[in-house]
Amino acid sequence: MAVLAPLIALVYSVPRLSRWLARPYCLLSALLSIAFLLVRKLPPICNGLPTQREDGNPCDFDWREVEILMFLSAIVMMKNRRSITVEQHVGNIFMFSKVANAILFFRLDIRMGLLYLTLCIVFLMTCKPPLYMGPEYIKYFNDKTIDEELERDKRVTWIVEFFANWSNDCQSFAPIYADLSLKYNCSGLNFGKVDVGRYTDVSTRYKVSTSPLTRQLPTLILFQGGKEVIRRPQIDKKGRAVSWTFSEENVIREFNLNELYQRAKKHSKGGDMSEEKPVDPAPTTVPDGENKKDK
């Protein structure tokens, strides 16, 4: 099942994935990921390259290069076990392929390694990952409107994502959150987002750290009556996020979306938006920072 699940997900995501891969960021990233393969395999480029093969063939991998590529494959398979979307799978392949390419180029010639590293740095500085642009029922807040909206009508339940555009985890979660908003948004249950990378005072007020070391992005908070009820991921005593997978199933279960949606629809049909009693989250123990290790 560990092998079949990603394959099934890939088949169902082919149309969306093809549009995603057709963007310049992905095309350039793919080119950088196979750069060593092209240099090593394509004549006349490969003809003058050094090699450790016994037959002296410069246009084929030597045993050490094969070992590095096999190690890359093992790392990608391990990392992709926790990936939720196809974009995450492809992103992991791109990232670790570039690392392997850098090692292979430095091993081949330090000048080629420095050139490849320079190209990667230029790519990171000039090309940004494609943002999700699909359909959604999400209201975007700034540092002033978030408090006003949460307090404006306390009968409305809000689920707010605190995100930053530079975070790969936030980008991977974007289509999942958009799908949830399409399924569950109604008059009494609304979805919102606020960019804490841009509005840093919001991150301070709602205690969402933007440091990559804390791994708190993205953060989902459920507000009822203008007050926080549930937050994921939870935070341990050292201020680090407790490992939690941002899958559609986990969000639905932890935030009781089915119950919230049915209750909101019932109140909407009856014309009675009375105060909703808070939904109790599933009991979860936050481990001490002394013992918790990121999975």
Swiss-Prot record:
It is found in: Endoplasmic reticulum membrane; Mitochondrion membrane. It is a single-pass type I membrane protein. Residues 49-102 are extracellular. The chain crosses the membrane at residues 103-125. InterPro entries: Thioredoxin-like_sf (IPR036249), Thioredoxin_domain (IPR013766), TMX2 (IPR039101), TMX2_thioredoxin_dom (IPR037463). Residues 114-269 form the Thioredoxin domain. One of its GO terms (molecular function) is identical protein binding. GO terms for biological process: brain development. Residues 1-48 form the signal peptide. GO terms for cellular component: endoplasmic reticulum membrane; mitochondria-associated endoplasmic reticulum membrane contact site; mitochondrial membrane. Residues 269-279 have a biased composition (Basic and acidic residues). Endoplasmic reticulum and mitochondria-associated protein that probably functions as a regulator of cellular redox state and thereby regulates protein post-translational modification, protein folding and mitochondrial activity. Indirectly regulates neuronal proliferation, migration, and organization in the developing brain. This is Thioredoxin-related transmembrane protein 2. The gene is Tmx2.
